[in-house]
Amino acid sequence: MTTATGTKPKKMEAFKMERGVKYRDAAKTSVIQVRNIDPDQELLPKPSWMKIKLPAASAKIDSIKHGMRRHGLHSVCEEASCPNLHECFNHGTATFMIMGAICTRRCPFCDVAHGKPLPLDLEEPRKVAETVQDMKLKYVVITSVDRDDLADRGAAHFAATVREIKALNPECKVEILVPDFRGRVEQAVEILKQNPPDVFNHNLENVPRLYREVRPGADYKWSLELLKIFKQEFPNIPTKSGLMVGLGETNEEILEVMQDLRDHGVTMLTIGQYLQPSRHHLKVERYVPPEEFDMFRSEAERMGFEHAACGPFVRSSYHADLQAKGELVK
C-alpha cells in the first residue's frame, strides 16, 4: 500500500484515485471546496498547557506495534496521529481501526488517509480477537474508517468483530466507535443488534453551523438519529459521543450540542482540543483553556450526563475503560 501526499492536481476533473493508495495532506484535502486551506497560513502558537513531554520508547509501545503489524491490523492511534499514543501504548491499551486504513470521506480535520479502499479482510474480526487475547485486554475500543462503498456501510463487519472478541475473550468489555452509516442507519442498527457492544459511541465532532466545513458528507441530524435509534433498541447500553473545540465554534454552540445529545439519550461525553495534523488541514482557531473544559464538565453533570471527560488532550477512546467506570478523566 502506497501513500500520496502531493500537491493539488491542476485539473481536478482529470484526477483519478488509484485503489489502495492512501491519499494524505494536500492530496486529500485540496479537493475540498468548502474552505480554502492555505499551507502558508500563520499558525497559532501552542500555549503552555498544550505542551507535553513524550515518554521514551518502551517495550510496551514496541510490543503493541509489533502485535498490530503481525496480524496486519491498524490502530486509530497511529493512523490519526493521536497525541496520546505514547501514553496509551505505555499503559498497554490501543484502539483498533477495522475495515482498512483508507477512508471514503476526506474530513479536513482528520489525519486518516482518504482514497478507494481495498476489499474487506473477512479474517480481520478473528485477527482482532486473537490480538485482544494476546494483549490480555479487559476493555477494548473498536473503530473504523468510513466505508460508504459498502452496502451496509460496514455494520456487519462491526458485528462480526464484536462476536469474535466476545467468543475468545468472554470477560472483555467492547466499546464500538462507529461512523454515521450514511443512509443505512436503521439497517445498521438492526445488524448490530445481533452482537451488541458494551458501549456504543458515535462522535458528532463539532457544531451544526460548521458541519459543511468540518464534516463534509455528514449530517448533524443523521448522527443524532443514529444515537437515538440505538438507545431506543438498547436502553441499558451506554451511548457516548465526542466533540472537538477550537475550530471556530462558540461555547454557547457547544452547550447547545450537549443538550441535543442529552435529548437523544446520550449518557457519556468527551470534549477535547482540536489539533491540526498538518498545514493542509483546518487550522486551529483557538486554544481552549483548561478552565473552560472544567466548565463543560460541570455543565454536562448539570444536564444529566453520567460521565463527561473534558480536557485539552481528551479523545473519544482516551482511557475509555476509566470513562466506562465513571472515573475522572481530563
UniProtKB/Swiss-Prot annotation:
Cite the SMART domains for this sequence.
Answer: Elp3 (SM00729)
Record-listed E.C. numbers: 2.8.1.8
Keyword set for this entry?
4Fe-4S, Cytoplasm, Iron, Iron-sulfur, Metal-binding, S-adenosyl-L-methionine, Transferase
GO CC, alphabetical: cytoplasm
| GO MF assignments | 4 iron, 4 sulfur cluster binding; lipoate synthase activity; metal ion binding
Record keyword Transferase present? yes
Residues that bind [4Fe-4S] cluster 1, according to the entry?
C77, C82, C88, S317
Which parts of the sequence belong to the Radical SAM core domain? 89-306
NCBIfam families, from UniProt? Answer: lipA, PRK05481.1, PRK12928.1
Full protein name: Lipoyl synthase
Please report the organism this UniProt entry assigns to the protein: Actinobacillus pleuropneumoniae serotype 3 (strain JL03)
